[in-house]
Structure formats: structure tokens, C-alpha cells
Amino acid sequence: MEIQAAIVLIIVFFLLLAFSVPVSFSIISASLVTLIMFLTPHFGVFISAQKMVTGIDSFTLLAVPFFVLAGLLMSNGGIAKRLINLAMLVLGKVPGSLAMTNIAGNAMFGSISGSGIAAATAIGGVMQPLENEQGYDRAFSAAANVASAPVGQLIPPTASFIVFSAASGGVSVAALLMAGWIPGLLWALLCMVVAFVYGKKHGYVIKRDHLTAKVVLKTIWDAIPSLFLIVIIIGGILSGYFTPTEASGVAVVYLSLIHISEPTRLQLIS
């Protein structure tokens, strides 16, 4: 009976996917159909509702929507642009600096927002036109953006470790966050090495005027609030001041305060 139920579940799931039903609805529908077929209809519906409620009844998983909201606030508040300016300031006229800026921006933005897709969209949306203006190969620009987008899923703070902790039965979130630093930074560094070698080979060097001390200080000052968020979240979790879920709420409040203090930068999220 278990084998038959598994077969029905798989067939219904892929059949719904073939008709372009969203994955989440396909999972729910396939599970519900399987339960109804192998249990009484009333009991199957009851079990489905109970499992859905208990499945999301997790204080730890509550951090995920908060980190998603934090990512939306970052995408719509000019924070991505400030991180890009800081990365460009540091990298300067290094060969392949625009692609390296894209990679560094994805790492910083993705770690704060917890979303590789949000990082690729926000950072890539700003960097792609700049790279095109400097004569970068479009395929190379897209590859640098896509390859570095998931880096933020390893560099803390990131919601993926929180989900893993909840699914694995309570692995220490603090330990996971600290363990993500080395592979995340190594991934970003290797991507930047490839961008440097490719940029040097093809002569991808940006031309810009000499930066004044005022511009340098302003760029650093604008990026400090965004970078300080990492210090608040990681420091708060490791010091025990708040849990990862509470840290996600603090991130939302902190970003909201940044937007309130600079209302001209804030774009309403529809």
C-alpha cells in the first residue's frame, strides 16, 4: 500500500506540473489526492489540514518571511546601489573590476537579504548596464552575476541556515552561521579571481576620474548603515541577546528606520 501511495503521489505531482500548475499547489494537491484515495475522504482532509498547520507552526521558521521582507526593503531602498559604490571604490581600476564588483555586491547583498535571487536581480540590474557600457561580453557579465548570486546563502546572516536548523531537528543556528563564513568567502574569492584573469586577458579596465577625499568618505559613510546590519545580527545572535527569529525582526526594524530617515530613497513595495 505504501508503494502504491508513493506511485500515485508522484504521478499526480508530475501530471500537475505538466499542466503548468505552480509547484507549491502541485505538492499540496498531490498529497491531498493521495490521502483521500488511501484514507477516507473526511479523514484525509482532516490529516492534510492538521499537517499543514503543524508544519508551519515553528518559531524558528518565522525568521524566513522576516528575512524576505528585509530583502525587499533592501531592494527598494537604494541599499544595493550603496553597496555597489563601496565595492567599486575598493576595487578601483583592477582588471575586471565591474564583474568583481558584481560578485562582491552579490555576496554582501545576498548575505543581508538572505536571497540569492534578490541579490542577482538588485545587483545585476545595476551592474549589467555599466558593464555593457564598458564593453564587457554579455555572456561573461551574466555568468559572473549568476555564479556569485548564491554566495549570500552561505555568508551569514542567511535564512537558509535557519531553515536547515528547523528541518534537522535543532542544529545550532549560531554554529551554522559561523561555519558558513569560510566556504562563502572562498566561493566569492574564487569567482573574483576568475573575473580578474578574464578581465586582464580582455582588457576590461574602467576609466574614471581621480576620486576626491570627499567622494571617498561619502561612499564609505553611505555604506556603513548597510554593513552595520551584519554586525547587529551576527553579534546579537552570538552574544545571546536575541534568537535568529528575533534577529530577523530586528533586521526589518533597522532597515525600516534607515528608510524613514531617508524618505527620498524609499520606494513603496506594492
Residue spans for each PLM region:
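Single conserved hydrophobic/aromatic residue that forms the stacking wall/gate
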Residues: I258-S270
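Juxtamembrane and boundary regions of transmembrane helices in multi-pass small-molecule transporters
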Residues: S168-V171, A175-L211
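Membrane-embedded alpha-helical segments and adjacent helix-loop junctions characteristic
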Residues: P41-N132
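Alpha-helical membrane-interface segments at transmembrane helix boundaries
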Residues: A49-S58, M88-G92, A174-M178, I182, ...
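Transmembrane helix boundary and interhelical junction motifs in multipass membrane proteins
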Residues: P22-I28, A80-L83, G114-G124, L154-F161, ...
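Membrane-interfacial amphipathic/re-entrant helices at transmembrane-helix boundaries
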Residues: E2-I7, L39-I56, Y204-A223
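Hydrophobic mid-bilayer segments of alpha-helices in multi-pass membrane transport proteins
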Residues: Q4-F14, V21-T40, L62-L69, L185-C191, ...
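Alpha-helical transmembrane segments of multi-pass membrane proteins
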Residues: V64, G96-G110, Q134-V151, L176, ...
